[in-house]
Regions:
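Conserved acetyl-CoA-binding loop-helix of GNAT-fold acetyltransferases
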Residues: 95, 101-114, 137-141
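Acetyl-CoA-dependent GNAT
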Residues: 7-11, 18-91, 96, 109-111, ...
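Charged catalytic carboxylate motif
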Residues: 15, 107, 134
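Extreme N-terminal starter segment of soluble prokaryotic enzymes
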Residues: 2-4
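Short, charged/polar, Gly/Pro-enriched secondary-structure boundary elements
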Residues: 160-165
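Conserved beta-strand-loop-alpha-helix junction that forms the acyl-donor binding cleft
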Residues: 100, 126-136, 154-158
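Conserved GNAT acetyl-CoA-binding A-motif
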Residues: 116-127
């Protein structure tokens, strides 16, 4: 496998959205919400999760890098840098199912960490859900330390009385 990591191009968005939906299906907050409440506002969890990539591309397109194997995108990482706080953030990382378990996620994270370090940042953040065992194994193996656990809640507003006018 000959992997090249290159900067994101606008034309990459559909493919990285596809990778996102495939990779995050079993470990996505939006999927958990849909499993509990059903489809919301006519938009399924996959639409919501793919939309996160649109937001990443709008916020900091230079922070997205894709991994190619023989010209095909097989993974990506999104990052954004808070230079004032000295922290680099990794909101999304996905690898094509046929390329998992071969070190590509590790390679993409290492690439991002090198970018953060070269930019003068002092720390990097990444987060994962409790149900994402791959992330929980990978991130500590790369030196990340768990600092907190978070619980996510959702409320169906149809169950709430209308405000008085």
């Amino acid at each position: 496998m000959s992997i090249t990591i290159r900067p994101y191009r606008d034309s990459d968005l559909p493919r990285i959205q596809q990778l996102t939906v495939e990779a995050f299906e079993p470990v996505c907050i939006d999927r958990n919400i849909e499993d509990r409440f059903g489809v919301i506002a006519g938009r399924d969890w996959a639409w919501r999760k793919a939309r996160h990539l649109t937001g990443d591309a709008e916020r900091e397109p230079a922070g997205i890098h894709v991994a190619e194997n023989d010209g095909s995108i097989v993974g990506y990482i999104t990052t954004w840098s808070d230079h004032e706080a000295g922290i680099g953030n990794i909101p999304n990382l996905a690898v094509d199912r046929d390329h998992r378990g071969q070190g590509l996620g590790r390679q993409l994270i290492a690439f991002a960490l090198d970018v953060f370090k070269a930019a003068g940042l002092s720390h990097a953040r990444i987060e994962t859900l409790d149900q994402n065992s791959a992330g929980q194994n990978l991130y500590p193996s790369m030196g990340f330390r768990e600092v907190a656990r978070q619980i996510h809640y959702c409320l169906d507003l149809a169950d709430r009385p209308s405000p008085q006018e």
